Amino acid sequence: MIQTAEAQAFLNRIASLPRGPGVNLDEVLQPSLDDETELRRLLATDRSNARLSNPYVGLVDVFEAPSDIKTTRTRVVKDDQDLNAKYIMPVPEDKRKKEGEPCMVSDLDEFKKNWSIFSEGSLSQLKDWNNVIAAGGSVLACLAPLSDADKASKRAIRKYYHSAAYPTSDVDLFLWGLTPEQVSSSYPCLLWTVEIDVLDIGREEDSYHLRGCS
């Protein structure tokens, strides 16, 4: 995937940040947030707009991005008062990532390995991902780097995901760009392929949401 102009501008802003903890990311993130707001406006009011013809608009290919975007930039917490003022659910000190540590897996292959274990291989037979999107916490979990101990073996990874970190996790799939008739005809194939217990199927605007757990 070739980075869009907006994505490249975001990556350039990240790369230009000074090194060291406590760097304010607001000015870096705000232009991208403003652009997302504009894309949402176009989606609601002008769907024929040329910007929306690119299926990757608003996205960043994190696996093809430089290391700057994959590196932790820590906030500086002065004291307990500062912590309580800025965080609703503060992370314990021993769980906070250190400055300069990786904030995501190193490459796509590592993500795929984590995803296969997290989903217990339930999507391994889904060969055609056209109009199917996996999103939500399950994807973020597989993007997050694991400690050496937690990734020592497939058994260790499985134990971490399903016993320690995400014991009640689920996998969210979204179907897009399909008519109701196409969705109806696609579901039997998808449900046969995805060997999961389906918890919920619902429509969200122009997409269909299938939620299940392994």
PLM feature segments, named:
Residues 1-214:
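Catalytic cores of the polymerase beta-like nucleotidyltransferase superfamily
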